[in-house]
Amino acid sequence: MWEVAWWRPGTWGGLAMRVGQVAFAGASIGVMASGAGFANYTAFCYLIASMGLQSLWSLGLACLDVYALTVKRDLNNALLVSLFVIGDWVTALLSFAASCSAGGVMVLFKRDVLFCRRYPQLPCGRFELAVALAFLSWALSATSAIIMFCLLAAF
């Protein structure tokens, strides 16, 4: 069976996963916010809000991982892991919903109503990149949520 201990809180693997979540979520926010007209579409605003929450949650846990690695403290107790499970599942579900809704709007724009062809000033490429980055952030977040759930089940 695959070992989840390497990815638990307070380890280098856990820190790497959190840094990846922050990086992809932050990049998604930056790319989406740099596209003119994103604020006219609710799904894109929701994506930015969701990725902002994902960034804050993951940054906080990354800082906690750095602290635990610095002082060599074990974060493997039931109360902390329970908190991580709840936070990870909430942010993973919100990230997935935001990524899917923004992705759906992009499919509508590009393939169904051909907005991207009719309005070349609309930065569809940036919007698509932001959605792809959000999905990558969600993938790491969902992985973290599953690992935390497995760790909680082991108590």
Curated annotation (Swiss-Prot):
InterPro entries of this UniProt entry?
CASP_dom, CASPL-5
Which ranges does the record list as Extracellular topological domains? 40-43, 99-128
Q: Name one matching Pfam family.
A: CASP_dom
Q: Which UniProt keywords apply?
A: Cell membrane, Glycoprotein, Membrane, Transmembrane, Transmembrane helix
Task: Give GO cellular component annotations, separated by semicolons.
Answer: membrane; plasma membrane
Q: Which domain of life is it from?
A: Eukaryota
Segments crossing the lipid bilayer = 19-39, 44-64, 78-98, 129-149
In the bilayer, the protein is annotated as: Multi-pass membrane protein
UniProt main location, coarse:
membrane
Q: Where is this gene product found? A: Cell membrane
Instruction: Please indicate the ranges of residues that lie on the Cytoplasmic side.
Output: 1-18, 65-77, 150-155
List of glycosylated residues? 40
What family name appears in the similarity comment?
Belongs to the Casparian strip membrane proteins (CASP) family.
Q: What's the subunit arrangement here?
A: Homodimer and heterodimers.
The protein's name is CASP-like protein 5B2
Per the UniProt record, the source organism is Oryza sativa subsp. japonica (Rice)
